[in-house]
């Protein structure tokens, strides 16, 4: 009599396994995300080519000094913004995951990249969601050279790797990982087990063949990559392509990168010919015209290895509600509440009866604390209905005691602002330039009261 297959219960969000079903995942605290999956015994690989890892067919112990320090040469994707996010180009043997909402432009960007790379190397584009005719129509509409790019419509990972062994490409795109499946996994495509095992299989194939594999992934409603968390641990680089549906600009950000900086940012513009690089991102995020308005300030972000000028807009208005509204777009809601408390305690401005709305222009998401001072001065400008000078740039972290703390790369931020024509800057005292910046008047402040005093004299 055949034994009944073993089962386990796996969380669809984080991949945690349990011996029985429960309503809430004790690992990630999500509700109703645990599903039953069948377990199969992992047999020894019948193909020795798939048994090695990182290019080695058999594992062996080495001393650290015996390992070659020669860096694997990268190759360019054809897009300098994408190369920047990847850390300087595509590394052979790397496994890259790129996610984004439907319509963000993931497939369009990768099709443009692959058509360009196919001129000088063997490139394979595997589509599992679209037919070959649909991909060909998109390439024709975008005016892309399509005579060299190899195409394959397949969802079986084993078959994809077998065909790739015959073609021997230098780069493979798999669109998308959620529709791929392995025959040995007893679950439907898109399940936790299938996504995890397919990604691991493709990653192992990339390492053993020294072929770069780019996998397309779906995202959840909150903007995180769908599938188990172990998916992000298995790959080398995780990218997220973001952009509002009604916006012509897209931002590509690295959330994990073993070959470069994390949180590196690349900016693209969506056109009729596909995605185009934006060489000067600061220009598109500064939307101010000739008319000076209150509640607007400019700060310098540090995204990965590049400085970026961003405009912050604030609107403070008397509230008709018992509980005034606090809305932050592009900024953390809790950070806004914290700064309002600091402004009341150490700045003497009471906004408890005011509605407060804050927005970062261009859809940029700001997570670093260097935006604190710029946000506070924008709030004060709106509250007093007094515009800030157009040639003023601001950055600095604000502490709970009202102190202004320095931020990393202060000199580079000031220099970037000067390049864009800004004449004045309010910065923390700890970021005081070691030498004078040409055509830039720098005001250094230690406390919030110092910043308010500078603001009154501008």
From Swiss-Prot:
Record-listed E.C. numbers: 3.6.4.-
MF terms in GO: ATP binding; ATP hydrolysis activity; ATP-dependent DNA damage sensor activity; damaged DNA binding; zinc ion binding
UniProt-annotated binding residues for ATP: 100-107
Alphabetized UniProt keyword annotations: ATP-binding, DNA damage, DNA repair, DNA-binding, Hydrolase, Metal-binding, Nucleotide-binding, Stress response, Zinc, Zinc-finger
GO biological process, one term: recombinational repair
Alphabetized SMART domains for the sequence: AAA
InterPro entries linked to this entry: AAA+_ATPase, DNA_repair_RadA, P-loop_NTPase, RecA_ATP-bd, Ribosomal_Su5_D2-typ_SF, Ribsml_uS5_D2-typ_fold_subgr, Rubredoxin_2
C4-type zinc finger segments: 11-28
Enzyme's top EC category: hydrolase
Region (Lon-protease-like): 355-458
Motif RadA KNRFG motif: positions: 256-260
Domain note: Has a putative N-terminal zinc-finger, a middle region with homology to RecA with ATPase motifs including the RadA KNRFG motif, while the C-terminus is homologous to Lon protease.
Family the UniProt entry places it in: Belongs to the RecA family. RadA subfamily.
Job description of the protein: DNA-dependent ATPase involved in processing of recombination intermediates, plays a role in repairing DNA breaks. Stimulates the branch migration of RecA-mediated strand transfer reactions, allowing the 3' invading strand to extend heteroduplex DNA faster. Binds ssDNA in the presence of ADP but not other nucleotides, has ATPase activity that is stimulated by ssDNA and various branched DNA structures, but inhibited by SSB. Does not have RecA's homology-searching function.
Protein name stated in the entry: DNA repair protein RadA
